[in-house]
Regions:
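Positively charged n-region of N-terminal signal peptides that target proteins for export
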Residues: 1-5
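N-terminal leader/targeting segments and the immediate start of mature chains
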Residues: 6-60, 200-232, 236-241
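Solvent-exposed loop and beta-edge segments used for protein-protein assembly and interaction
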Residues: 26-30, 79, 141, 164
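Hydrophobic/aromatic beta-strand elements that line small-molecule binding cavities or substrate pockets
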Residues: 50-55, 73-77, 156-160, 183-187
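An acidic-aromatic
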Residues: 53-120
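Gly/Pro-enriched, hydrophobic low-complexity segments
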Residues: 63-67, 86-91, 139-205
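Surface-exposed, polar helix/loop patches in the mature regions of secreted/periplasmic/lumenal proteins
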Residues: 91-157
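Solvent-exposed helix/loop surface patches that form functional interfaces
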Residues: 108-125, 130, 164, 169-171, ...
């Protein structure tokens, strides 16, 4: 069973399932500070792999960070509906910047469709195509709706928090395995506690992804690059000479 090595892999499956569908307009996003747990297991789920991760979301930005990790990912929606991607290395106080060209070369989608799945885990188009049932129970006083159906042929069950535009629980059932994403904590006292601030980001050393290949022979760069193995495309750079 595939191990979820980093946060990119936690969300890759969700994004690949959802961004293939047509883009549908999304309701306004509330600022969110939430912790999720992704569980992957081979059916009948006697053993599982669990990954805890955080999402800090504003209407124009999403930061994703695996619990206790030294790195995080920052996605920012630009005015032109293109996504800006940064890989933040907090211990090294560095940020790897990826241009739109870099993202295309790495086959990473960076448009309004992907933004919707990043900030809500499910697209509005997919929700609209599923069987919808209002629940009597609530989550922290917020209304819940269940959605049942298939996303790209995969059996899917969602318990949706309408006001937050995020799942309380999301279950994908494959022929041989199951993936569950569960909201386990929501901080309402400080919506951005733990998120990287603009001041922190400004103090970090900016590194362009396109320049990393030229740094690999620097002994200083090799030290911090060794801690960037989870950054997109770094396995490719590691094989260049």
């Amino acid at each position: 069973m595939r191990k979820l090595a980093n946060l990119v892999s936690v969300l890759t499956m969700l994004i690949s399932l959802n961004v293939a569908t047509a883009y549908a307009e999304q309701p306004a996003l509330a600022t969110l500070n939430a912790q999720f747990e992704t569980t992957e297991c081979a059916l009948p789920c006697k053993k599982s792999i669990k990954t805890n991760w955080w999402m800090w979301r504003t209407p124009t930005q999403v930061e994703l960070k695996k619990s206790n990790a030294a790195n995080s990912e920052l996605w920012t929606m630009q005015d032109n509906n293109q996504l800006n991607y940064q890989f933040l290395m907090h211990d090294e106080k560095r940020v790897i910047e990826y241009s739109s060209i870099d993202l295309k070369m790495l086959n990473m989608q960076a448009d309004a469709e992907k933004w919707q799945v990043l900030n809500s885990l499910v697209s509005q188009k997919d929700l609209a195509a599923m069987k919808k049932t209002k629940l009597k129970k609530q989550y922290q006083g917020l209304d819940l709706t269940t959605y049942a159906g298939k996303i790209n042929g995969i059996k899917t069950n969602i318990t949706w928090i309408d006001a937050l535009q995020i799942p309380l629980q999301l279950i994908y059932v494959y022929p041989k395995n199951q993936i569950t994403v569960q909201l386990i904590k929501r901080d309402t006292a400080d919506l951005l506690a733990g998120a990287t601030t603009a001041a922190q980001l400004q103090a970090y050393q900016q590194v362009d992804y396109a320049d990393i290949g030229d740094m690999e022979h620097s002994s200083t760069a090799k030290v911090w690059l060794s801690n960037a193995t989870d950054a997109p495309g770094m396995h490719t750079h590691g094989h260049q000479h």
